[in-house]
Amino acid sequence: SIPPEFTKMAPKNIGFTAGIESNLVPPAWLAKCSEMDLLVVTSQHAATGFKGTIHVQHPETGEKVAVTYGKPIQIINYPIKNLQAEDMSAKINLDTDFNFLSIAQWGPRKNVDNMLKWFVEEFQNDEVGLVLKTSRVKNNLADRQMCSAMIKSLAEKFPNKKCKIHLLHGTMSDEEIHGLYKHPKIRAYVTTTHGEGYGLPLFEAAYSEMPVIATGWSGHLDFLCIEKMTPKGKVKRESLYEKISYSLEPIQKEAEWPGVLDPGTKWAYAKENSFKKAIRKVYQNISLFERRAKTLSD
């Protein structure tokens, strides 16, 4: 749920939310969260957003006043799903031997359009695939046709390309989704997301020992990095994923959602050159990245 839905129901109340995908929490959220005795979020990114100070304009005086959240916050990450991945090699017959995977709703926040365009530009001379599990709004035939048409429109701009985009659409069970992470021809997970409260598909890919390529900002950093002790006794965070560089910029106009994603809030914009270098690097050095993914999973 999101904080506007929080309601005091008992002497002690706990609010649970995945939080935000941008850098700031709407002021109205802070007011509702302050009614709770404890706030539980899924990532350090979400906790930082709630702890940050937000300046808003006083409706009567026009002056800027500070709105802060001062109640306790606890971070609880998602658990690993204890299930048996379904063998998807027969159900999904891929004619490209090396494939990336991305699972995302096709909307502004996931940045799917840029990811597809940059992928085709980088691999137009290579027999490499991208398996895209997506939908625009619903898992129905009209939605599938819309997604297929958008991919076809992109492909027509590169008539001689060797790479392929494989569309997956429709409802899949958890066992089938986890089967994608274990498919012998699907070798790495990739996303150019603008921001995640946590990033569940990335988490599932990571604990399934799949190499991950991702924008280097927001909630998924909780599980894509490990803490190591230096010889001097200091704790150092080590990234075990391939990071896509980014710039923090205001969200797009079409992504604005008053009371959730307010105008002026920011999120990450993956850099094109960094993305292309990352997918090329993983493609050329997959054994190295698979060993790194195994270390992260352990």
Task: Annotate each PLM feature.
Residues S1-F50, E176:
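Extended catalytic core of nucleotide-activated donor transferases of GT-like folds
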Residues L38-A85:
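Donor nucleotide-sugar binding/catalytic pocket of nucleotide-sugar-dependent glycosyltransferases
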Residues L83-N99, E122-D126, R291:
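Nucleotide-sugar donor-binding and catalytic loop/hinge architecture
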Residues N93-K110, L116-V120, L130-L132:
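Conserved donor-binding/catalytic core segment of Leloir-type glycosyltransferases
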Residues L141-L180, R187-A188:
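Nucleotide-activated donor-binding/catalytic signature segment of Leloir-type glycosyltransferases, i.e.
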Residues G179-G197, Y207-M210:
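Acidic donor-binding loop of glycosyltransferase active sites
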Residues P211-A214, L224-C225, P231-R237, E242-K243:
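Short hydrophobic beta-strand element within catalytic cores of glycosyltransferases
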Residues S274, R280-K281, L288-D298:
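A short, well-ordered alpha-helix in the C-terminal region of glycosyltransferases
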